[in-house]
Amino acid sequence: MLADLHMHSTFSDGKLTIPELVDLFGSRGFGVIAITDHLCEDVTPIGKAARYLGRTLTPATFPLYLEILKSEAERAREQYGMLVLPGFELTKNSALNHRSAHMLGIGISEYVPASADPLELARAIRVQGAVAIAAHPVHTRKVEKQTYHLWDRREELAAELDAWEVASGPYLFDEVLRSGLPMVASGDLHQPEQLSSWKTVFECEKHPEAVLDAIRKQELSFRFFQDSIYGKEQLHDVRVGDLGVGALPDAV
């Protein structure tokens, strides 16, 4: 069951609406997606700018966001047989990379202000029965803002986070592969051209709780998906229990 657990809609900084995301992934046979729009802290200049520009979920927009996710989840199930999980990306952006942190909540049902410490944010996600995932915690291999704060605190946060992204888009992160931490792989899609990326594969029941439990238990594998519209489709499997870490290049 092919899954992408990190993507953005027009509720934050994505180019596609939620229905368009459902159609993009559903038409390609995905079994599970999580829509995870940014929810930025509102106490910093960067966070305030995101609110001004309409690039973040807010207490005012969050109820409508959940309502549309619920409606589209029903359509996705009926039209594509695809599971849609509600999520957000708690976003703490600083001018300094080592103070910036992004954390996914998947399976969420309640708004969580992003201004708290990451330790408290993870607990606020998990108390809802959702999973907390460190988003792109190391260098993404792209020229963009980096978010190192969770990785800097990985020993402290290891017991509070359910998984760490081992890939974001087309790049695998050697540091996370070698860490022994639980992992997922996702695309961090903002526009259709980013569809080709590493994905997570589940072999569990197609049910929200089964998927969340598979993340917690690490009953999953990774697969590179290259969309046929942008090139020849190729799938390459990487299983969590058989990563061949010793053959990987040195970590960055």
Listing of model-derived features with the role each one plays in the protein:
Residues 84, 132-133, 183:
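Hydrophobic beta-strand scaffold residues
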Residues 87, 135, 186-187:
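Generic beta-sheet signal
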